[in-house]
Amino acid sequence: MRIAYLHGGTIPSFFANGVHVMRMCDAFTAAGHDVTLYTAPGSYPADDAYAYYGVRHRFPIRAVPIPEDTPAGYWRRAERVRDLLAGDTAPDLVYGRDPYGLAAAADLAPFVYEVHQIRRDVSPPGTEHRLLGHQRLARVVAITHALARDFQEAHAALGPLPILVAPDCADPPAPPTAAAPTLPGRPDVPRIGYVGHLYDGRGIDLILELADRLPGLDFHLIGGAAEDRARWEGSCGLPNVFFHGHRPPAELPSYYPSFDVVLAPYQRKVYTWGRLGETGRWASPMKLFEYMSHGRPIIASDLPVLREVLQDGVNCLLRPPDEPDAWADALAGLVANGALRRALGDEARRQLLDRYTWRRRADRVLAGLPGPRGESSPNKHAANGF
């Protein structure tokens, strides 16, 4: 099937949405589909986007600039994307997270709209509602059951929507191609890892409190924009905390084996870059699945949305995000219990390989949709609705 993937953000970038988009295009290509990605030009200096993200396939990427960072600019770019789609070989399916691009191209082919939050910023108001009512809408993909329920409620006037729930995913680790990075700190103490952005609501303050309470452990935080790293480093001052800053996604797998325990201390309100959105109710964090793919023992926040994937005492330990005593006890106990670490990590990896790979997700989100000449995509890994 010929798939046009429409992304309103930039490639390459240091944002998580770029990782998600590139992984999905890679997985669609691995499944035998002919994929072209339409994106905005890169906002991060990387000569080779494929190498930067560590994807296995070199699908075409067409960069379409945003003339100005306003709704009018987004619409002008969307019309340019539509012109390119109309001039190229017609796609069998348009897929994406860009409501402007999908709305502009809705008459060209059936389309799938993937949602990661309920957006309040699409202009003019009603654009998304009209998109969801279009006769060529084939499916809505939501990353969590919580989001699917809220999204359906927000658009209840349209009646039942064709929503499929497909969580984020991770790839099984590839064989290492380079030596593991040499980490600062003490070589003979347990290493606690966090991988991800340093935005408000990600629990960085909780990590620093744990580091203060447990001076016998070293804490390594991988990721974060320069300004966020500087803000947290400036308020830290602990000798057992190390901020490593942003790393290309392709390099992250080399860090995971160094960590004895990994943390996902999300708070009840989780913010995106610049506090432009609050997504804690609906999150499906890619870092959790990457932790799982590497078989690392996880301590995560006990939040309803995370319980869609995580099970306390089975594939992780869950603790309330606002109870640092419980986190400190759990971390100290897990560090001291090698058998429990192995059991949690092994089960997390088993579940990842069985349920949450990008290839499985690619098959699931396309299952049953019309393909070339009206054929249906195979239902090999069909997902349930919500």
What are these regions (language model features)?
Residues H7-F14, D26-R76, L147, L161-P162, ...:
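N-terminal strand-loop element at the rim of the active site
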Residues P285, D312-G313, L317-D325, G333-G338:
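Conserved acidic donor-binding segment of nucleotide-sugar-dependent glycosyltransferases
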Residues A4-L6, V141, A170, A174, ...:
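Conserved donor-binding/catalytic core segment of Leloir-type glycosyltransferases
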Residues A104-A105, V122-P124, R130, H134-P162, ...:
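A short, active-site helix/loop in glycosyltransferases that binds the activated sugar's phosphate group
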Residues R202, P248-E290, A300-E308:
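Nucleotide-sugar-dependent
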Residues M1-A46, T89, E209-L214, D218, ...:
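N-terminal subdomain of nucleotide-sugar transferases
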Residues G333, L340-R355:
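A short, well-ordered alpha-helix in the C-terminal region of glycosyltransferases
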Residues V189, G223, R229-V261, Y271:
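Nucleotide-activated donor-binding/catalytic signature segment of Leloir-type glycosyltransferases, i.e.
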